[in-house]
Amino acid sequence: MHKVELKEVGLDIGLAFAKHFYKTDYLHYGYWTKGLTVEPANVFEAQENYANFLLEHFPKGVTSVLDVGCGSGKFAEKMLDAGFKVDCVSPSPNLTKHVKARIGNRSEIFECRYEDLSTNKSYDLILCSESFQYLLLEKAMDKTQSILNDKGHLLICDFFQRNVSGKSPVSGGHKIERFLNYMKTQPFTQIIDKDITRETSPSLDIMRDLIQEVIFPTWNIMAYYMTSNYPRFSRLFSFVFRKKIAQAHRKYFSGGTSGEQFAHFKTYRLFLYQKNN
């Protein structure tokens, strides 16, 4: 049986919230340009900005793309509509259902982790849009080398950990210094390195408001109901899951998940690398 990881559940819940509150199927951050007010009504526009930003950085001559960690398949659909040949890697069974419903047989969908991918195909571009943080660096780069065409490209758009003290309320991301040093040892040439932390960090302010105004009050109401009606079960539940509950409070309910905090601990970058012959 497939073991469900917490991050997988989080992405599926995130998609449900995105559809209901923001009328979007994208799962990535928004790209908040100057003049675009940071408010829920503009989330979809910011995410479209992000999607277009990615497309603008596709190198000339690219026709085939592997979308690693394709989320709901929304951006894969956008690439297909733009004329690219696109295949997808989708390790989450729940999200894969959304991908299949969206793009059908227009793409081959590999239902596995990227590191475990087995295929005879090769691609002009490997795209990791907010999926690189979940990959095992060394194994992922070995896989990338093996399935990229000669002089093919790797496009990464994701956040990384800064070398600062303290603990970020937003987990995830490779350490930026380790990543950059490791890539210097790989048969790749860096073409682009763009810091878009300022443009993406406002997405955390949107997330914070949703948590504080909707999710946290709902959590408190449910907790009040359970402790009032099922006190013994509630005490047992609170004891068994005390570490997870404390983690949820620290990460989500403390109010620290803000754009300012994100920008302090993380750096959001777009990297374009070309494979050497």
Could you say what each language-model-derived stretch is?
Residues 44-61:
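Conserved alpha-helix/loop element of class I SAM-dependent methyltransferases that forms part
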Residues 1-34:
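N-terminal, positively charged/glycine-rich alpha-helical extensions of SAM-dependent methyltransferases
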